[in-house]
Amino acid sequence: MLHSPPEGGRSALHQQLSAPLPEQPELVLVTDLDGTLLCGSLEQRRAFYGWLARERHRVLHVFCTGRDLASIDRLLVQDEALGLRAPHVVIGDVGCTVACGTSLTPLPLAVDPIERRWQGKHEPVAALLAGTQGLSPQPISATRRLAYYYDPDTFDHGLVAEIEQHGVDCLLSDNQYLDVLPAGVNKGSTLVALLELLELPPDRVVTAGDSLNDLAMFETGLAGVMVGNAEAALRAALPRLPRTYLAHGHGCAGIIEGLHHFGFGHLWP
């Protein structure tokens, strides 16, 4: 955990949100985007997005993604025709950003502890990686993370240990992404801290993802849905994830399948 939740944290966080959350949600659904919520046939996606929109009063939806806020903003415009609406809360930048889903404004109560862990890390790590073979910067606007594309054939994987000597974590995922994150910060740690701030019961939470940067969510012990199109490296971790269900369906179909598996099928029409 990044920090102990401050007394009165729930009410303080609600004050930082631009739109209210469900008071007592029956389900807290935490979804990755690419390969998960954004995957499936157009028919499946329209049906699932429509359900999320109709059930906002009892399903608290959280995006938990590697995308930065600018990319999420573009996505919500791009997929509006499919019925995709803003979530209640966004965890972005692989856990380094927490924002109101409606306004995409960062929430200081959740972000400040992450910011403190990143202080003094950016410059030395960026200098170390400058010009590294098999590595190219991702065009993102994140301030608490370094993000690169990497070529698994030419990148020197031995460099990961050298990167982490700077007091950061280095995460490889989907055979193409390399993220440098504040030590101890990931999708799972930030999600757990958010749930504690909001005083949400863990037995109402279901997470869903498809790539290696979702592993930290599944390692929390919360109910997890590994969608059927999950990358091989994530599937390999399944035997040590007793609370994670491997769905047959891809993307949205897999999420729905997982909701039924964990006893939330009554919420689906």
What residues fall within each predicted segment?
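Active-site phosphate-binding/coordination module
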Residues: 42-137, 229
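Short, aromatic/basic amphipathic alpha-helical patches
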Residues: 76-78, 160-163, 234-239
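Non-catalytic pre-domain segments flanking phosphatase-related domains
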Residues: 1-33, 44, 50, 54, ...
